Amino acid sequence: MTIKTLALQCRDAAQVVSQLSSQAKCALLQAMAAALEADAGTILAANARDLEAARAKGTASAMLDRLALDDKRLAGIAAALREVALLPDPVGRITREDVRPNGIRVQKVRVPLGVIAMIYEARPNVTADAAALCIKAGNGVILRGGSEAIHSNTAIARALQRALREANVPEAALTLVEDLRRETMLELLQLNDIVDLAIPRGGEGLIRFVAEHARVPVIKHYKGVCHLFVDASAEMELALRLLIDGKATRPSACNSLETLLVHADIAERFLPLAAQALRERKVELRGDAATRAVLPEIAPASDDDYAAEFLDLILAMRVVADLDTALAHIRQYGSDHTEVIATQDPDNAERFVQSLRSAVVMVNASSRFSDGGELGLGAEIGISTTRLHSYGPMGLEALTVERFVVRGEGQVRH
């Protein structure tokens, strides 16, 4: 079956999903969660095959962490589906209502986007998360995962499709692309008359390929080169907490810290504390000349290090003269994802917030809060770094659009 045929079937199924009541969608997602639990053995066995193949290829530890499933992670995925089921339904929500002087009633109403193509790598949880969010928002979804997770993705998709069938919803509403050739993905990205939005999540190469070749509208979920700037006024213990949580708790996450910027006035006090805490957690440190003057044992940092999304226990460090220098560094090397300042100076905090265009800006809070669930969205399909209708963590509402509904009693304009 061609990718165009699959997309057409998904579009037809999306029309069915768009007409489901909130109650029906809630029940469907609950059933999808139960299907994952029922198929746990099959899914974990499939994941073991993917992990074995990935290790044989020498896959990096960060990628292996993203790929791996276990009982706890699978239970978390099922729980996340149940949480999505209970979220408020954005479809049909009236966001504006007005009666014009001529008597027509004008409403802006949220409706599903239609068909969403999700293109991603090495994250089998995305198969379930994206399916749940897209269906809850009344859409169909085409899932194109990476070859490294093909067995996991297939097992998860089969379980979810069974729940769709049992609810009398066309299983094409959740379409998994099993032909992973690049030319097939390229054909999918050309189907702008069928697919309404493409969302790539993965490495820089994948996202650039999608952005450069798509005729379908694209919202990029670009790499997370996230910074922590420790201002001269920062409380040391607070800054250390932000640093350790941001770098060492889950370095493979896109909201983990990759670069530490430290104000020169406190570098001699803060850097030794930071280095000790990070070494205890096996973090490799790389720094500029000013950082190495305080920490001579660490490796030098290159321009490539400052632009890198390590997704590993590696941290680039730099001493900066002031807030302006920190901002200039972030503008040069950042990816518009998430930036953090540790400061007790309210003026500097406000200038940091106002001077950066990043999707998420934190003041005295960990970069790890850059997550849809943590920010009150309930769940997210990703973190948009594209300044379009959705910027930052994308929840259910971002998978809908507003349209006008006008009701009258025969009014004409002329």
UniProtKB/Swiss-Prot annotation:
GO MF annotation: an example: NADP binding
Q: What pathway does the UniProt record associate with this protein?
A: Amino-acid biosynthesis; L-proline biosynthesis; L-glutamate 5-semialdehyde from L-glutamate: step 2/2
Q: What is its EC number?
A: 1.2.1.41
UniProt entry tagged with the keyword Transport:
no
**Reactions listed under catalytic activity:** L-glutamate 5-semialdehyde + phosphate + NADP(+) = L-glutamyl 5-phosphate + NADPH + H(+)
Keywords assigned by UniProt, alphabetized: Amino-acid biosynthesis, Cytoplasm, NADP, Oxidoreductase, Proline biosynthesis
Q: Name one Pfam family in it.
A: Aldedh
Question: Per the similarity annotation, which family is this?
Answer: Belongs to the gamma-glutamyl phosphate reductase family.
- Name recorded for this polypeptide: Gamma-glutamyl phosphate reductase
Q: Which gene encodes it?
A: proA
